[in-house]
Amino acid sequence: MLYYLFEWLHKLNFPGAGMFGYTSFRALMAVILALLISSIWGDKFINLLKKKQITETQRDAKTDPFGVNKVGVPSMGGVIIIVAILIPCLLLGKLDNIYMILMLITTVWLGSLGFADDYIKIFKKDKEGLHGKFKIIGQVGLGLIVGLTLYLSPDVVIRENIEVHTPGQEMEVIHGTNDLKSTQTTIPFFKSNNLDYADLVGFMGEHAQTAGWFLFVIITIFVVTAVSNGANLNDGMDGMAAGNSAIIGATLGILAYVSSHIEFASYLNIMYIPGSEELVIYICAFIGALIGFLWYNAYPAQVFMGDTGSLTIGGIIAVFAIIIHKELLIPILCGVFLVENLSVILQRFYYKIGKRKGVKQRLFKRTPIHDHFRTSMSLVEPGCTVKFTKPDQLFHESKITVRFWIVTIVLAAITIITLKIR
């Protein structure tokens, strides 16, 4: 909203109004404003949660030995993150930009889904929360909306990067002058760092392009669901999900910025995405909101984000990566979320195999995997064998959290580096 006001003032030659025309200025304003909202207003909101007794309820020490110490800590703090994202974006962003619109829809959509889950847990005293199938329906629905919008909207275009080889000279990367609707996505080790989904269904002949878009929509749904659930599982220790997501967000911000700048896109040999500069405003608000929230969520946590926050930030990361055509970098960048997901899936699969044989068995002492590193064998179900018992030394949750942050930083660096691998 302020963007349009200052654009009007700039036309009237109002001093300083032209600053709002610079993406870098609005991005810095977004991160500062989001940080202030989440840290200053966040404190007041936490006190309100305490007053209304919107807190973690009693946990069963047998099924959740680590949760018993968290009883009484305010939950649903994800509202702080959501508000701190929305306000800067509404004030500083171009609200007619299709990418900004999609990100705002994602924030509200998954925020509402997570809020419903937390509401049922806290106010209805149902520890299971929203039924799993409704969560999946919500995530799939969002993935479908995002995928179809990117397919159908005339504003969603790219300019393809083209490698020009001249004998005796270094390869030069140029971008086409025409805006294209494309099913291409960025992936290292492929020609021009691009993979076209339509090429994967080339056997369909003249229908390959349409089939490529169909495949893209399916992948969009899968990525949104997987990353959203991964972030949800990662939110098991104080500061864990917020810290990891801020690091991932910063990396996505770099990728969005270089994708929106034709010279940087040429240097990295990636596609140029007109209009994606508005995503830099959004992701800066996202980072600022998470850092401000981390002020209260770091160990010992004064507030938990709940599913209101974790489902939302996971979905934001997924949709953002899809919009900038970097979704196939997610397994690297969001490696921590991927491992959290896989640990739970493998644990259940291994348990079911043992159950068929009449044997109690586990792959890990406890999942998601971050809990494995702080769980002693004495907390494992009696008579149950565990495949992987290492490490013998147990770690405090703050040490595990920081180490997971370090792993995410390394994965973020690898993600950026892969773009220069030929």
UniProtKB/Swiss-Prot annotation:
List the Pfam families hit by this protein, alphabetically: Glycos_transf_4 (PF00953)
- Broadest EC class? transferase
The Enzyme Commission number assigned here is 2.7.8.13
Annotated GO CC locations: plasma membrane
Q: What is its main location?
A: membrane
InterPro entries found in the cross-reference section: Glycosyl_transferase_4, PNAcMuramoyl-5peptid_Trfase, PNAcMuramoyl-5peptid_Trfase_CS
Residues crossing the lipid bilayer are 28-48, 71-91, 95-115, 136-156, 211-231, 239-259, 279-299, 313-333, 399-419
Where would you find this protein in the cell?
Answer: Cell inner membrane
One Gene Ontology term from the biological process aspect of the record:
cell division
Which GO molecular function entries does the Swiss-Prot or TrEMBL record give?
Answer: metal ion binding; phospho-N-acetylmuramoyl-pentapeptide-transferase activity; phosphotransferase activity, for other substituted phosphate groups; UDP-N-acetylmuramoyl-L-alanyl-D-glutamyl-meso-2,6-diaminopimelyl-D-alanyl-D-alanine:undecaprenyl-phosphate transferase activity
Q: How does it sit in the membrane?
A: Multi-pass membrane protein
Q: Which reaction does it catalyse?
A: UDP-N-acetyl-alpha-D-muramoyl-L-alanyl-gamma-D-glutamyl-meso-2,6-diaminopimeloyl-D-alanyl-D-alanine + di-trans,octa-cis-undecaprenyl phosphate = di-trans,octa-cis-undecaprenyl diphospho-N-acetyl-alpha-D-muramoyl-L-alanyl-D-glutamyl-meso-2,6-diaminopimeloyl-D-alanyl-D-alanine + UMP
Co-factor(s):
Mg(2+)
- Which pathway is recorded for this entry? Cell wall biogenesis; peptidoglycan biosynthesis
Q: Which UniProt keywords apply?
A: Cell cycle, Cell division, Cell inner membrane, Cell membrane, Cell shape, Cell wall biogenesis/degradation, Magnesium, Membrane, Metal-binding, Peptidoglycan synthesis, Transferase, Transmembrane, Transmembrane helix
Q: Which HAMAP family match?
A: MraY
- Give the protein's biological function: Catalyzes the initial step of the lipid cycle reactions in the biosynthesis of the cell wall peptidoglycan: transfers peptidoglycan precursor phospho-MurNAc-pentapeptide from UDP-MurNAc-pentapeptide onto the lipid carrier undecaprenyl phosphate, yielding undecaprenyl-pyrophosphoryl-MurNAc-pentapeptide, known as lipid I.
Question: Which family would the database say this protein is a member of?
Answer: Belongs to the glycosyltransferase 4 family. MraY subfamily.
Q: What is this protein called?
A: Phospho-N-acetylmuramoyl-pentapeptide-transferase
- Gene symbol here is mraY
